[in-house]
Amino acid sequence: MGYFYLTAETWTLLVAFVTLLLIYAYWPYGTFKRLGISGPKPVPFFGTMLHYRRGFFTFDEECKKKYGKVWGIYDGRQPVLCVTDPEIIKAVLVKECLSFFTNRRNFHLNGPLYDALSVAEDDQWKRIRSVLSPSFTSGRLKEMFEIMKNHSANLIRSMKKKADKDEPLDLKEFFGSYSMDVVTSTAFSVDIDSLNNPSDPFVTNIKKMLKFDFLNPLFLAVAFFPFLGPILEKFELSFFPKSVTDFFYASLEKIKSNREASQQKSRVDFLQLMIDSQKNSGAQQDKSLTDHEILSQSMIFIFAGYETSSSSLTFLAYNLATNPEVMKKLQEEIDATFPNKAPVHYQPLMEMEYLDCVINESLRLFPIAARLERVAKAAVEINGIVIPKDMVVMIPTWPLHRDPEIWPEPEAFKPERFSKKNKDNIDPYIYMPFGSGPRNCIGMRFALVLIKLAVVEILQQYSFSVCKETEVPFEMDIQGLLAPKRPIQLKLVPRS
């Protein structure tokens, strides 16, 4: 019994510790009860995160059905107000966007990406966004278009090798390499040709970066004990593998140094615009980027450009293969716009109405941003709901895009929903594949041009077809980004 003997002081300390631990564990979970907002019951430390084991999009959909347009969840100890009411969404993303809300929450585990546009807040965010915005104007996209066409031609040639052998294509592999080649070429004037070099370190490293798990021990540690975030940040711990961020920052630093040392007139690309902001601002530091900010924006552009475009193209190809009547109608528009497989030009491509409908419908089913987040900088009341300071407001686009009260037959692929006749009836705060408001996806138009060019040039020559390797319907991955659990495989059938 001696092993179990404790002094009165020790027992007092033990009881005090357990009491404090229980208070700490349960303390935040009365937030939504006090606000009069319903939601799933949290468990100590985890909050409602254990539901993510079935997929966060499934969880969001179930909550919307059960609790209506507003509910509360807990990511660990962090209260998260979930909103699908269009009026509240408009206030959060647009009306009060800059005055009462800042960017998504910061877990302090960003590594060297601490000053990327997706993490920056308030004045820093405004400064970076203002420098980057000119990269994505229609004029810039037209300049980039011929460069994109070089890589779309490489994509067709690579796909042809599989088509000639009647072999299925792993779509993400092809579209990922195409996206990477377009991004690095248009952003940095560097041709890595990952379509022909799939083991290129740019591609292998970006794949490592995309492996994110909501139940990652580092993520859970910060979710359970938020005060650890800034401490772990001091030790330079990050969600992203250090070897990956080191590789990209070293590569981008070399590209930047070579650009600055070169006397030749370089292409006016994403990198050059950022470098020019330093040269042209003089003493006006509020109109330029630091050296590190330039590298961070370059890194996030590679990451976002690769993942969003390649995933959207993959889902689009699947939707066309499983809806051949839609694909046939799209091919008819392509043939009418570019007769006899004529070269694709920017302006007519941008004016293709049915192509827009098809892409919009695919993005409805598989939005690039399945969740949008903002954090309250100060307490604010919107539509009778009090949002306290530091509250995370989350807008789940997945259930919004699949709400049967808004979209009849929500699981069906019906591009006509976005026809001229119907699109004016679509609430812009219901359909938000790229987000909305001042903080929407800055590369939205770039991604759409990249997607349109690839799908039109492929469908000029081929049709997508399901095969025995195609999983219909496919199973969604439950971790991290919106993606299929297993690679989507299709065949290309030459058009007669």
Curated annotation (Swiss-Prot):
It catalyses: an organic molecule + reduced [NADPH--hemoprotein reductase] + O2 = an alcohol + oxidized [NADPH--hemoprotein reductase] + H2O + H(+). Highly expressed in liver and intestine. Moderate expression in gill and spleen. Low expression in kidney, brain and heart. It is found in: Endoplasmic reticulum membrane; Microsome membrane. Keywords: Endoplasmic reticulum, Heme, Iron, Membrane, Metal-binding, Microsome, Monooxygenase, Oxidoreductase. One of its GO terms (cellular component) is endoplasmic reticulum membrane. It holds the Pfam family p450. One of its GO terms (molecular function) is oxidoreductase activity, acting on paired donors, with incorporation or reduction of molecular oxygen, reduced flavin or flavoprotein as one donor, and incorporation of one atom of oxygen. It comes from the Eukaryota. It is a peripheral membrane protein. Its main location: endoplasmic reticulum. Gene3D superfamilies: Cytochrome P450. Its cofactor is heme. Heme binds at C441. Its EC number is 1.14.14.1. Putative steroid 6-beta-hydroxylase. Belongs to the cytochrome P450 family. This is Cytochrome P450 3A56. The gene is cyp3a56.
